[in-house]
Amino acid sequence: VNQFKDEVLAQHDTDKINLLFNNAGIGGGGSFVEGSREEWEKCFAVCWYGVYYCTRAFIDHIVSSEEGHIINTSSINGFWASLGGTPHTSYSAAKFAVKGFSEALIDDLRVNAPHVNVSVVMPGHIGTSIAENTGKILGGKRTEEDLEKIKENMIKMGLPVHNFSPEQIEQQIKENAEAFKNNAPTTSAQAAEIILSAVKRKEWRILVGDDAKAIDEWVRGAPEDAYNISFNGERREDI
């Protein structure tokens, strides 16, 4: 990260940074109880430490600028740790950390660097390659046991894969990743426009997508119901 910082400063011939976008993220590490510790910690490291280390590396250069803004990407899973009733622990824990860190910086910057703003971005379903890239980053060939667990999760999410072979599950994973990107209600270009417009207005809390706004409203309106199995199904039908 420090090498990246040095290269950015050198390429732009400056020691000051005005905008820092922390946007790295992968999935994986679904179950804390039964999942791989290595996969869990890799997902958490990318999603949380990617934000922390980059902010730590660039903070002095942001503070030394006349005006600065830190933009951290959390998720709807940073305030609602659910994914269709299936385990989603590492990603959600990391995105909660990003949201908490960003909110804590508001007072810190107001006191110690009032010319620097911070925003936390909470996207809903955006058409990106995160599902596909997660597999590339986590690496390794899936075992039949891995595929069986994935199959069980797909069934819980309502996918008709009961009679699928391991090879068919692999193909379904690929198709799901493509569908996640191509069938999203909000494209990455639309998300970028929403985020940049909100940053210009110096909003600290940026919800991206109608689904994100709806889920935020539902969770705030009925927090005790947010993790009931029926909550997820009812809300999906309403979006």
Which residues make up each language-model segment?
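Conserved amphipathic alpha-helix within the SDR
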Residues: 1-15
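Conserved NAD(P)H cofactor-binding loop of Rossmann-fold oxidoreductase domains
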Residues: 23-28
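Substrate-binding pocket helix/loop in short-chain dehydrogenase/reductase
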Residues: 31-32, 39-41
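A short, exposed helix-loop element centered on a Lys and neighboring polar residues
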Residues: 55-56
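Residue(s) in the substrate-gating loop at a strand-loop-helix junction
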Residues: 75
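The catalytic Tyr-X3-Lys active-site helix of short-chain dehydrogenase/reductase
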Residues: 81, 88-97, 101
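SDR active-site lid
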Residues: 111-206
